[in-house]
């Protein structure tokens, strides 16, 4: 769970 993944 990365904050970069939810930004995709």
UniProtKB/Swiss-Prot annotation:
Q: Which GO terms describe its biological process?
A: neuropeptide signaling pathway
Does this entry carry the keyword Secreted?
yes
> Does rRNA-binding appear among the keywords?
no
The terms describing its cellular component in GO are: extracellular region
Q: Which residues carry this modification: Arginine amide?
A: 8
* Coiled-coil segments on the chain, per record: none
Originating species = Karoophasma botterkloofense
The family note in this entry says:
Belongs to the FARP (FMRF amide related peptide) family.
The entry's function note states: FMRFamides and FMRFamide-like peptides are neuropeptides.
Cellular location of this protein?
Secreted
What's the protein called, per UniProt? Extended FMRFamide-2
Its domain of life? Eukaryota
Query: What are the protein's UniProt keywords?
Result: Amidation, Neuropeptide, Secreted
